[in-house]
Design a protein with these regions (language model features):
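Terminal alpha-helical anchor/extension segments at protein ends
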Residues: 1-144
Length: 144
């Protein structure tokens, strides 16, 4: 049996399940980032040279995106040693993580990708075990 990873991810946290001959292990990674709400005074200026101005909200958004990129990097590094990866979760985070795998030419290791609602760590573990138990072995082979 190879190392199989399944993970539920959103912008706040990733719950990662590792399945291997040694057993099952889990890891939770928190992003520690919150999307900052736009404040009423942050709207772009309508002045003559407004195209040269950088609104405060754009600067915050860039910081937010950099922080998320670091989070996706940490999640990728936690799972990149796996032979197969199953990614699921709500929203855009799973797609952003998929891009991390593609950027590093590891996308062939992704054997499952699907939407999922908020789940407890126990539900994540159960879903990952069920995925690998019921997915045909031929689909789990990566260049063997």
């Amino acid at each position: 049996m190879k190392t199989q990873v399944g993970m539920w991810i959103d912008h706040r946290e990733a719950n990662i399940v590792f399945l291997s001959p040694a057993g099952e292990r889990t890891r939770q990674i928190k992003s520690n980032v919150e999307k900052q709400l736009r404040r009423s005074g942050d709207s772009p200026s309508r002045e003559r040279y407004e195209t040269q101005m950088v609104p405060v909200s754009d600067q915050r958004d860039r910081g937010y995106m950099r922080h998320l990129a670091n989070y996706y990097e940490e999640v990728f590094l936690a799972a990149h040693g796996a032979d197969t990866v199953f990614i699921f979760g709500p929203g855009e985070a799973k797609g952003e993580l998929r891009k991390q795998f593609q950027k590093r030419h590891f996308s062939e290791r992704i054997v499952g990708f699907e939407p999922a609602d908020k789940m407890t760590p126990r539900q994540v573990s159960e879903k990952v075990r069920n995925f690998y138990r019921t997915t045909p072995a031929i689909l789990l082979r990566n260049g063997d």
